């Protein structure tokens, strides 16, 4: 059921007051894809009275006051994305459209929404209940961080928002514990997965360089970020604190990851999977076209790409739902009156991480000295695609389901490492679960740029492309990489797709026979990337990939990512050496234009 958004709904529920009021920068969509809805439904399922105020008018009290004041706390989120990312392009132009706003116009979410909403509440409720910040905007800005839009180091968002608590990461457990302890009159400052402000430093926590120090010294900023990044795994992380003037930001160790059973329970909650009627009157919400008939199979990501925030926010450990949980949800989708038989996506951050576990990580936490997929797939990971193969086969058997597409994209290096199931997974995918285009994200081909991104070298892409085309077009595999300059070929992975897999895929080619294509995603102007690198990519794309790429984005330095650290410091954190960083907006655009244009200039 929908959570109430108006006084009329409270009256209908015979509620005089709410325990928790959640405020968000997106339209209210009751869906498991929307973080504030998940938090709301988790709290409601635990017996708390929860309401939602979506995209309140920041120039009056009409919206922010319409549900009154909560008994326990206010929860504040900027929405599914950082509000500055949602509102501006990588070249700092205002975005005109918004997929998460009714009507599609980007005119309802303020810049720095978390700070604005928190101060809006303080304006109209002077001595109110605790303000709890959450969501990706708060999570990635919880310590001193580089802010691309102001080109400055900003202090923890807790200080600017004048809030009481911040919950970081996927915060169901922490938020529920806050509600329970506030209800019972208990202290909340010992809860894992939260940050708060203290007049004194805690004992036995690691001290980060002070805010004032990291503003003045890039080496201190790098030291701060490295320590912060290495203390995010629930099994190994220590508590942290950072001085901001006379006060201290305190970060408690993270909450344990949800178990698969706990994740199943969340997706079994009573989501309506639609826009709340109050917001439907304001127009269509474009995001519904994608999320309404899609399935999330897992959380977390093994990739740890330097430009991406998923590993920090969702975790570097993949937690997969049970097949039964996913099938149950798919059966619910099939019963919806507007379901046409097509599940638009079955996946997560990367579709083919479902069901793949690292036993070491489950018991000892994420490694401090290496990554799961970079520079090669770790031997401890033991990729096994059999769980997803079985899941996809089960989805096809559901009454009313015509197709279940895998649109999230896949990691071809992870597939390459699964010698036992590589062939059968590709056959399953191509024959039944690709809508015409399969997404992959090599991001670049220049060796140095890929290294700074934390992405695999290009040989894995070439191997994968050959096999995909052999299946779908009957092309002969190419034994040589044509059109690749020495810098691109240098340090390429020497791993090959297993020969047994290649033979099997060739055998299945005629039975599949579908005309399908690979869609490639690339990034321009990442730290370390030059115009010459983009010309190299342009040449490679035309000669080897046989495409003129259109899916190209200019790099945006997201708060609390290693790529953002490189952008600010102009230093490679792995070597300590200075790197080239393009910061001129016109030249960033030129890097993109080089590859999307029809000629190399």
Residue ranges and their predicted role:
Residues 82-91, 140-142, 172-177, 202, ...:
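Flexible glycine/acidic-rich beta-alpha junction loops that bind and position SAM and/or redox cofactors
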Residues 22, 38, 57-58, 332-476, ...:
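Conserved SAM/AdoMet-binding glycine-rich loop
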Residues 2-5, 215-255, 262, 268, ...:
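Radical SAM enzyme core and accessory elements
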Residues 164, 266, 301, 326, ...:
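Conserved, mostly hydrophobic/aromatic
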Residues 201-203, 476-512:
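Intrinsic disorder/low-complexity segments
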Residues 35, 54-244, 249-252, 256, ...:
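Glycine-rich beta-alpha loop elements in corrinoid/cobalamin-binding modules
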Residues 59, 188-220, 225-232, 246, ...:
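Terminal amphipathic helices with adjacent charged low-complexity linkers/tails
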Residues 23-28, 282-309, 340-342:
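N-terminal pre-triad scaffold of radical SAM enzymes
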